[in-house]
Regions:
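Flexible interhelical linker loops that connect adjacent transmembrane helices
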Residues: 1-3, 130, 178-208, 247-262, ...
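Membrane-embedded alpha-helical segments in integral membrane proteins
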Residues: 26, 30-34, 87-92, 144-159, ...
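C-terminal membrane-cytosol helix-exit motif in multi-pass small-molecule transporters
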Residues: 171-190, 205-217, 233-248, 445-453
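Helix-loop-helix hairpins in multi-pass membrane proteins, especially solute transporters
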Residues: 62, 66-199, 410
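Membrane-interface helix caps and helix-loop-helix hairpins in membrane proteins
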Residues: 98, 189-194, 218-224, 351
Length: 462
């Protein structure tokens, strides 16, 4: 690929490498959940917080990225985020209780949340338009596909060593990338003295935390007003106040003008709902395979690995397909493949063979790979002039919805299984009903695509 801005390309490559490592940490803990339950004497609903809190903090960190990228140099942001991630990984490695593990996961997510959107912004600022699809496909691989490889890597490490080595592995690789960043990441975008609206930052934290805590607590507290209903209400009310404030003040934390573009909204909703399902699957499938079907952590990870590989392949080619035949037919095929995959998951039982579990996850992997990157690229391309704010809105929405997805999935499975996901028919039925929920969501995506998604030429002529 011929590209004049070599410094920008090198910086982007380092950002992609850093994002890949940090995003793997998002889901690499899912095969460790049974071990956290044993070592720290906690429930499955509590253990999944190691996954959900990561997504929650990502959602919290993304809104201020529009401000951060306008205010600070890219190299400063990159180095700071990597140092935060390394410290978090070391805390997890040394954790002596579950609370310490959660603190480490929060710091890992803080580093990832600062880092993740910068690459997307760089693509639209330094790349020619004809390269947007390719590089956004690569970033889509990081946002939605790399986390799918986490369970496989985590399962292998656990079987060979123990769950703590996962965090040692992450820290060592990140140190190498930190050295490369210090030596080679020299490209900078123009910065400005953009003020931080602190009240907006606080509001964004409150609404993310409120929604996440409310949904996550359902498994342990039912529909308790204090533990569930109240946090959700606070989250929703705070979100409303946040939106009103952004539309009123002169220097908003996130400029919500991008939401006036209906096509950006459609694409963001599609990507968020698809990500909801992907995050839910990253939790529900390992729980079923290990606790219900009695496979090992490595086997659990290997069942998801081919799906991750096929998602990588289709994630790269799907933006190219969308450029050639239009985004609408690509997203329709994506939804149909996901419906077939989830329908197959409804047939799982305690004696399902390794080959059948693997093959059906492969079908679903094709559907997810076809959908995520084209939806994100399409949404961002229609508001390219406001890419910093569009990135913040798109990523925040996707991460918060993804965090809710992982929590709601476990909650539904656990409630339907009477609080104990184990080797019995009730747990099989709970998995089937959760898969049915995924089918319903996918049908909604199909309807959105048919009714509202348009190819770019049609938008211009609209």
């Amino acid at each position: 690929m011929e590209f004049e801005n070599k410094s920008g390309l090198i910086t982007l490559i380092i950002l992609i490498m850093a994002s890949a490592v940090t995003l793997i940490s998002q889901s690499i803990v899912t095969t460790s959940l049974p071990y956290y339950m044993d070592d720290f004497a906690i429930s499955s609903a509590t253990a999944q917080w190691t996954y959900s809190v990561f997504l929650l903090v990502l959602g919290v960190m993304i809104p201020p990225t529009a401000y951060i990228t306008k205010r600070f140099k890219i190299k400063t942001i990159l180095i700071t985020s990597l140092i935060l991630f390394i410290i978090g990984s070391l805390i997890c490695f040394l954790s002596t209780n579950f609370e310490m593990l959660i603190v480490g996961r929060i710091m890992e997510a803080m580093g990832t949340g600062i880092l993740m959107p910068i690459g997307q912004i760089l693509i639209f600022r330094i790349m020619p338009e004809e390269k947007w699809g390719f590089f956004m496909g690569l970033m889509g691989f990081l946002v939605g596909i790399v986390p799918a490889m986490g369970p496989t890597i985590g399962g292998i490490i656990i079987d060979l060593f123990n769950w703590r080595v996962i965090f040692e592995f992450l820290a060592i690789i990140t140190v190498v990338i930190l050295v490369l960043s210090i030596l080679l990441a020299n490209f900078e975008l123009e910065t400005q003295n953009y003020p931080l609206d602190f009240p907006s930052l606080i509001l964004s934290i409150i609404f993310c935390v409120g929604l996440m805590i409310g949904f996550s607590n359902i498994a342990e507290f039912g529909f308790s007003f204090i533990h569930v209903i109240l946090p959700i209400i606070i989250g929703i009310l705070t979100l409303i106040i946040f939106v009103k404030r952004q539309n009123k003040i002169e220097n908003p934390l996130v400029n919500l003008i991008v939401l006036k573009n209906k096509y950006f909204v459609y694409g963001t909703v599609f990507a968020a709902l698809l990500y909801f399902m992907m995050c839910g699957i990253n939790v529900m499938v390992p729980l079923f395979v290990q606790n219900v079907a009695y496979y090992s952590p490595t086997e659990s990870g290997l069942i998801l690995f081919p799906a991750a590989i096929i998602m990588i392949v289709f994630n790269f080619i799907s933006p190219i397909m969308a450029d050639k035949i239009g985004v609408k037919p690509v997203l329709i095929v994506s939804s149909i493949m996901n419906i077939i995959g989830f329908a197959c998951m409804m047939t799982y039982n305690m004696n399902s063979t390794f080959e059948y579990l693997l093959a059906t996850q492969l079908i679903r992997g094709i559907g997810c790979g076809l959908g995520l990157s084209p939806a994100i690229t399409w949404a961002m391309s229609v508001v390219a002039d406001d890419v910093e704010d569009a990135t913040a809105v798109n990523n925040t929405t996707r991460q918060v919805v993804g965090a809710i997805g992982s929590s709601v999935t476990v909650v539904i499975m656990q409630i339907l299984a009477n609080g104990n996901i184990t080797h019995n028919q009730l747990s099989v039925n709970s998995f089937s009903m959760t898969s049915l929920m995924m089918i319903i969501i996918t049908v909604v995506l199909l309807i959105i695509t048919i009714l509202f998604i348009k190819n770019k030429n049609d938008i211009v002529d609209d």
